[in-house]
Structure formats: C-alpha cells, structure tokens
Amino acid sequence: MFWVPAEARWQHIQDRAKLPSIGQDVDAAMDLIEKENPSLRGVLPRNYAREGLDKTRLAKLVDLIGSIGFTETDDHCADDVLGRVYEYFLGQFAGKETGKDAGAFYTPRSVVKTLVEMLEPYEGRVLDPCCGSGGMFVQSAEFVKAHGGNRSAISVYGQEFTDTTWKLAKMNLALRGIEANLGERSADSFTDDLHPDLRADYVIANPPFNVSDWHNPKLADDPRWTYGTPPQGNANFAWVQHFIYHLSPRGTAGFVLANGSLSSKTGGEGEIRERLVQADLVDCIVSMPPNLFFNTPIPVSLWFVSKDRHGNGHRKRVGEVLFIDARKLGTMVTRRLRELSDEDIARIAGTYHAWRNHDGGYVDVPGFARATTLEEIKKHDFVLTPGRYVGTEEVEADDEPVADKIVRLTEELYAEFERGRELEGVVRERLGGLI
C-alpha cells in the first residue's frame, strides 16, 4: 500500500496553488512521496520549479484538478478516475508521436483487453517481461475486480528496457494502487533478466516487433533456447522462448507478434515454430484486424501457448490448435486507427473459451474459427496463419437463376446511367446560371 504524507496530499498543494513557490511545493511533495514509498524512489518527476514553467498555468491546472469530484463509489473511486486519466494521456501521447519507436510504450486498450479476457487471470503470478507503461497489469487487475475477485489474488512481475517507460509503468501502477515487482531498475530481459527464477501462471506481453539488434554473444548457448537458437536478426522467437521459459508447469502465455512469425522460415524460425507445435505448446492463434496500433501498420496476431493442455481444469486439448480469423472485426475510429468493441472482444474470447472449456459447446464457424489437428498443421509445413485453416465464410443461399440475375442487374445498371445523365443536365444548367 502506498502512503502519501500530509504535506504531499492534494489539499495541501491546492491551498498553496496561488503562491509563487507552487513549483517548489510540488517538487517537495514528490520528494516526500518517494521517501515514504521506496518502490517509487527515483521515479517521480521533480521539475516543476524550473524557470521555463509558467507558474500561473501550473496554479490553474492544480485548481482544475482540484475541482474534480472524487467520490468513493463502487464504480468510480479516486484511483480508478486518476488511472483512467493517466491512461488517456498515455494514449494521446502515443498517437501523436512520430518515428519508428512512436507509441512503443503503449498497447491499445482493446488489444490488452482481448489478451486478458482470453487468459482469465483470476489469481496467481502474472509476468510481462516487456511491460511498457504497465497496461497488461492494469487490465488484469480490472478483470479480477470485474469478476468479483480481490486484486491481491494476483502478484505482478514486470521488466522494461527503457528507463523513461519503466518510470511511466511505476507511476501508472501506483495511481491504480497496484503493487508490483518491476525490478529495481530498467533492464534488458534477454541479457539481464531481473526475475530469473520466476515461474509465472500467466505471461501477458506485447514485445517490440521484429527487433534486429537484440542479440548479444553471451546468449549463444542460453538455456532459454530449448526449441532452437533464435536468428540474430529478429527477436520474435527469442521472446516466445523467454515467455515459455518463465511459465509454471501449468502456466499459459498470451502475447502479440507480427504476422511474419506465423510463416517465416528465415534463420531457423520455421524449425523453432515446428518444434513448438510438435511439443504441443501452441493452444490458439488469432489473426487480428489491421490498424490497431498507433506506431505501426504491421498486421499482428495473438499467440496463446500453454503447458496446461492435458485437462487440468479445462478440456483435454492435446494434439489440437484453435485458429481464429478476426481480421474483419473492429471499427475505424480515426482515419488510421481501428478499435475492437466489447462485443468483438467477447466474440473472440467466447470462441476460445467454448473450445477450451468442458461442455463449452464449441462448433467451427467457417471463415472465423476452426479447431485443427497437428497432423493437418504438419501438412501445411507448420505455417500457423489462421486463414489457411478456417476456410471461407458461409454465404446465404441465393435461389435466383444466374440468367435472371444478369438481366436484372443489367437493367438496374442502365437505370443508374440514365439517372446520372439527368443529374449531369441539372448541374450544367445551374452552373450556366452562375456564369
């Protein structure tokens, strides 16, 4: 639990908002909070007293935040409101950044929610070794709360390479009241694993796509490469094996990868993928719609790998893989960004649960979902692209004879031509009146 001393509480800051020292007062509050909460040491910003910051605007911002009515209702307690505000600004910054690393610290909420809803982390140890700003942990805690559980039922472990992003994650979780072990510092998960002995019940992650400069010579014979040494020019299958290495004997991982990982044979990736399938680790693959991410148009898929496919609490799924093609779902919310609705997410997660659970009532849906055997995957040379397996979408039967349809459509087309000529005449007439 985080403790805020009296001199750092919001009322104290608001009472001093009009004083010339407001910048120093905010910085002092940050110092006090860090002193009382060692897990936040070195994380909070202390630059509000700097010369270039307009103190009048800072005072107005303090008053504006102070005017928000934080009421401890069941649905909107203070940490929920502040957490959502923080998440909103993370999303806004991610959307406005440019360059190849733009928005890399932020996974869109609908993607995170899909992963969490499919995994259902009710309790246990949750790990994200490339945690960005901590969105996977926030959504996991919200999932537990939404299902009537206690957030303390999950233990959160994370790691982040970029120092600034690591600090964002620490602040994000602190605002939400979520205690987490993100290590004492930022660090590279491959060369400096901060949780080497952790075996998690759930791994939830969105690793950076197709990283080419990840390799270090000391990783050559790393014990994590059980299924093959990843190519030095692409970290995708290094991440996959890192996730599997950190799973408990009954653990499950859900993560995002670029679609190339489903079919690539570069640098031995095909052999690694084959061994993962043959080891019966791959549980489900979901092709996601395009344009879900701020920072890349690269199409992505969700992978679910599990060491728990022998019926412990779920249906025995040995020798099976579920493929879901969700590329047609979602709605464009801006010219270049798509989001999945709650209904879309429920459809994807519900399909997975129906297949995975006892008496789930699962049936294949042509064009959307199909349960496939390892033998069939072998025939496709261990390519895991869902479109190869789910088939085509069923269409409603059309009883109109082809010849009759051609006549009808031709007549409709000629009618449209005639209407076009009439409209052209009206436009020319009105334009003539303007000259």
Predicted feature residues:
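Non-catalytic, mostly N-terminal accessory regions of nucleic-acid modification and defense proteins
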Residues: 1-119, 181-194, 287-290, 308, ...
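Generic recognition of stable, solvent-exposed alpha-helical segments in well-folded globular domains
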Residues: 80, 84, 110, 135, ...
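Short, flexible coil/turn micro-motifs enriched in small/turn-prone residues
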Residues: 94, 98, 127-129, 153, ...
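Conserved S-adenosyl-L-methionine
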Residues: 101-205, 210-214, 219-226, 237-238, ...
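Signature of N6-adenine DNA methyltransferases within the class I
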Residues: 161, 192-201, 208-375
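Conserved, well-folded catalytic cores of nucleic-acid-processing
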Residues: 64, 68, 88, 92, ...
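A short alpha-helix capping/helix-coil boundary motif
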Residues: 91, 145-152, 250-253, 358-359
